[in-house]
Amino acid sequence: MTYSFTEKKRIRKSFAKRASVLDVPYLLATQLQSFKDFLQDEVAPEKRKNEGLQAAFTSIFPIVSHSGNARLEFVSYMLGEPAFDVTECQQRGLTFASSLRARVRLVIMDREAPDTVKEVKEQEVYMGEIPLMTTNGSFVINGTERVIVSQLHRSPGVFFEHDRGKTHSSGKLLFSARVIPYRGSWLDFEFDPKDTLFFRVDRRRKMPVTTLLKAIGMSSEEILDQFFDFDTFLLSKDKVEFTLVPERLRGEVARFDFVGPDGVLIVPKDKRITAKHIRDIGAAAIKQIVVPEDFLIGRVVAKNIVDKATGEVVANANDEITETLLAKLREAEITTVETLYTNELDRGAFISNTLRADETATRQAARVAIYRMMRPGEPPTEEAVEILFNGLFYSDERYDLSGVGRMKFNRRLARQDVIEYKLMVKGLASKAEAALKNLAEASGFALSAIQDLVSLMPFGARAMVENSTLSEVEALAAKLKPLGANVEVREQLTLSPRDIVEVIKILVELRNGRGEIDDIDHLGNRRVRSVGELAENQFRAGLVRVERAVKERLSQAESDNLMPHDLINAKPISAAIKEFFGSSQLSQFMDQTNPLSEITHKRRVSALGPGGLTRERAGFEVRDVHPTHYGRVCPIETPEGPNIGLINSLALFAQVNSYGFIETAYRKVNNGQVTSDIEYLSAIEEGNYVVAQANASLDANGRLSDDLVTCREKGETILAEPGRVQYMDVAPGQIVSVAASLIPFLEHDDANRALMGANMQRQAVPCLRPEKPLVGTGIERTVAVDSGTAVVALRGGMVDYVDAARVVVRVNDDETIAGEVGVDIYNLVKYTRSNQNTNINQRPMVRVGDHIAKGDVVADGASTDKGELALGQNMLIAFMPWNGYNFEDSILISERVVAEDRYTSIHIEELTVVARDTKLGPEEITRDIASLGEAQLSRLDDSGIVYIGAEVEAGDVLVGKVTPKGETQLTPEEKLLRAIFGEKASDVKDTSLRVPSGIAGTVIDVQVFTREGIERDKRAQAIIDEHLRHYKLDLADQMRIVERDAFARVERLITGKKANGGPKKLAKGTVIDKVYLDSMDPHHWFDIRLADDEAAQQLEQVKDGLEQARKDFDIAFEGKRKKLTQGDELPPGVQKMVKVYVAVKRRLQPGDKMAGRHGNKGVVSRILPVEDMPHMEDGSPVDIVLNPLGVPSRMNVGQILEVHLGLAAKGLGHKIGAMLRAQSSAKEVRGFLDQIYNSSGKSENLDELNDVEVLEMAENLKGGVPFATPVFDGAKEEEIKAMLAMAGMPSSGQMTLFDGRTGEAFERKVTVGYMHYLKLHHLVDDKMHARSTGPYSLVTQQPLGGKAQFGGQRFGEMEVWALEAYGASYVLQEMLTVKSDDVNGRTKVYENIVKGEHRIEAGMPESFNVLVKEIRSLAIDIDLERY
């Protein structure tokens, strides 16, 4: 393999046994791709797919006026350029968005001739702002970065389930079916305990299902025909003959003797008919058999029976045959009677019974009944009934199964091969009767069908033909087009009568004991709605509001001569979008503690949110791990607490397909031969295959070598022959998420602890000097690069300039496009605040002259080290008890760790002050504050704003501000002072911004925002000038490189050419050489007149190109200057806003929470002097002492293995360091490295590195050789021992330690080694808090709670019991009164303390008064009797 520029600096030794067949896909692809599909901004309007914004527009437009005389059509949309880039939006508190404009066409028809277009107006209309996604998959909303979390919701389609016997006391299973559309009414079918089948619409009152079947146009006869097989009886005067279908008799008890044609008895009466009997009946070829009359009595008539002579209906379908009816039938000379075939076992008479319970008789009556159920209390007019019913499931506007819903529906009804299409026919409503007749004749349709169609026009033209294949529908469309009908073929996304019937059929089959119910937690029944889809739904909701308003205004459009922009008001759209991105449950404040937390947040999948589950309603099953999660959703990473199992993370190789189902990657296997073909399968498809695990044994040719292979099939684990295997996992770690795959030796950790480990890595605070983990899993580089924290080269080239804040790269010629500037400038992020107040700082990794390729890491970010994720520090750890300081997971730490700033982190606090325009006059930001002394103002400049670099602590003034005070009555002394000095100092009060308590640090940045029209102060101007200076530097660098390239090209072009003349009196015919060119400024080279016309032309082109580049740079600079100098958008009433950023250094201290990567968390209990720490034989002290009891019960043994391997890594590093100090040759170093890298696990080709690179790499390995033990494919025990032996360490990983205080050896050997240990974001500085007198709650008058409110500590019920138990009555009294809510008492205490008297007078607690009032509000008179 080839190593990148960064990898060469430090190769990570991997213990993986299997070569990677598929690289980990880009980790943010789900978010970016989803939003890209939503916008489609890079696609030409005519080539856009019908999804995202395009789908939203096409589903609402065209909007037709009520009269039908005017319509507004959608043509296309375009997105403008965003006004500010991402960083500008973050600084100014703006939303990173671009304006959406839609081109719409207003078509006005002629009133006299409705088919004639009178006029057409086309115009671009502003449709609001659409927030844009940053390159890292987040959004900047009002200056803060947010993430839209994907939602896992129930897929549209049809689902069959039962109540698990919970509804009825008998434990009977009640089956139900539910049709869930993407949008529209839910349709439920359910059995009741008496086996009658009902339906509900939107969980309203239930009605017999036959009412719905009649409403969709079926008669009773048709209903019975659909759901039952028929038995045929032949009637004659004296006997009844039964037409035998032998199979139907199985399991029945014979009610008479079955005698064959030869008189042999086949089944005696009262005997159960078995399979043998049925074979005998078949062999005897009995077609008809005479049966007693009581065999027919009680059966149900299948079809209406009509007396042919009189035309009278003798029996209706679904009537029960009684003796009277039988006599009537004979009387009417009916010879054949068909009855329903039912039995107790597997052919229930459910539909028949339901039909009997149904009171409606006709289609119209059924529709009226449904109308009454949907709109109780409204009078059912014929038109209203039709509109409501057709709107329920047939209207495209109101009902949409969506593509995925239709796919799931068809799959469940076993119609996989037929995609259903429907023919939308519009433009018939205006045709006269005669025209419709012609149309009917030409198309071969009944006139009634076409008239039906016309009556359905108002609710989205209905289909003429449904559930047909594409070719059938297209053939019909071709017939209708010439007849003036507006024909459109589209997939059937509404329900059809056939759909409803088939759903009921399957439900009846389930009740009959055939078929299986659906598992709603199966990932084939749950789909992901990503950003794009969620945004599209919101946009559509906004458009629907616009549509209503446009419909109203369209009628005025023709009379008032309005333009499209007069009709459309973009506010509802903007409001819907703003509400979604700003306050939706799925739009979350981005977790930016470290790169991993950022990337995990974007890969999160939540079952909560609008249209999803709620915490309270979600049961155990939804939260549990399901077999289909394999490779799709991580079984480990989920929060602890009420959200467990509802919020998940995508697995490493998971991706979301076009339908929204999560897929995972598999290798194809053909007859036991594993290929390198990769296929992505969703949970639906995977159910049909046999899948082997990634660790299945393969021979040298890549064939499965075991006789039986462990596989998964239909959610079960089985052993299968190699020939049966169809797919194989791509990687052992494909079942876990990013965070879980960063845990080395995960396979040795208990799942509960692995969950904590995965979650706690996301809380790790970036350290001042990030350090790569000695023991990693090999995925650290992927995470660092994909998270966007590390800066990655966009194009290859040579590094031209480097400083702490920027890297300039001259791009390779073959990677530049003509007319493009061949310069990449990477402005690094310096000391910037993240959402969690941690510090984001990028450090360049390249030097001037380095050659880099596309994708190489140019600069490290927060928590990355040489392009690898580095969340913590490698610490020398000993597992032993130490004087109780590691009791209950406490952590004992050496003072050296603190002294070396190993866990020191920088946190940046943003403090804001605003100057408003008040009723009494404007507030002013100034240095002139009378009440402050010079010492307090010493850090402020002339504008009253703190200097950058000032060291500040709690209480210091950062920004001076005064607010006008209302005029008050002056005392005589003040009047005298004012008379003498004539000043008005007393009418302002000091409202300066001060450093809050608990913060002490350095001011690192100040930003001043001024409203348009208000004069900027000096400081604001200076900040703008500084910005412009930086921008100018960038442009100058670009220009310098462009010029250098241009001059190099010119030099190559004109050297050796003859000249006709030029500067410095160049004679005609002189050959130009280098000496001549070096003697003048390169800008004068363009004045040389060349003899060769072609070369002269090329020279002119280069000159023009340079001039154009200068012009472009001037325009860019001017644009930037204009942007910076224009006024800032500030909230109403705000004149000026100042933001001050203070960097706070947080050193490790007792009370801080720390953790390893295996869920081994604890709190620092004591920081011990180095000399007292336990030390090894050579005198080196350990850094951290952990409790050995924290391992066995927690079952996270991975930490022990990590410690052993970490020790080997460090030992090998020391050996390499010793070789370098001894100045060993590159060959010797290469030999030792080869021994380390190629003795086991994945081999590395060190021959690719030259000697200089080998020595540079060895220099980087001095601190330890980094190892990778991939999840489920990591280092074995023997390999760890081999590495320990190579490093010259004891293979047990245990050593004798000595007590630092006494110098004596501890009794037994102790496990010592290096572990990657993290400092978490739960810092004692943020939690420590003490209250003096502070705010009180308005109602109860008790002190508020919490640090943010400067609150008190709650003295709860149990604490009161404790004091009662001790009999400390006075302490208890003051706790419940003067220290809490006795208002008069606490004032009195204050007075007493001031007077020097130390006594209390407890009175009535305010909360008692609140209780009294509460009881009185319940109309109970309660009063206090005072004695």
Curated annotation (Swiss-Prot):
Please state the Enzyme Commission number of this protein. 2.7.7.6
Q: Any signal peptide, and if so, which residues? A: none
Query: Which GO molecular function terms does the record list?
Result: DNA binding; DNA-directed RNA polymerase activity; ribonucleoside binding
Query: Does the UniProt entry include the keyword Transmembrane helix?
Result: no
Q: Which InterPro entries match?
A: DNA-dir_RNA_pol_bsu_ext_1_sf, DNA-dir_RNA_pol_bsu_external_1, DNA-dir_RNA_pol_su2, DNA-dir_RNAP_su2_dom, DNA-dir_RNAP_su2_hyb_sf, RNA_pol_bsu_bac, RNA_pol_bsu_CS, RNA_pol_bsu_protrusion
Q: What does this protein do?
A: DNA-dependent RNA polymerase catalyzes the transcription of DNA into RNA using the four ribonucleoside triphosphates as substrates.
HAMAP family, per the entry: RNApol_bact_RpoB (MF_01321)
PANTHER family given in the database record: DNA-DIRECTED RNA POLYMERASE I SUBUNIT 2 (PTHR20856)
Q: Which family does it belong to?
A: Belongs to the RNA polymerase beta chain family.
Q: What is this protein called?
A: DNA-directed RNA polymerase subunit beta
> Which species is this record about?
Dechloromonas aromatica (strain RCB)
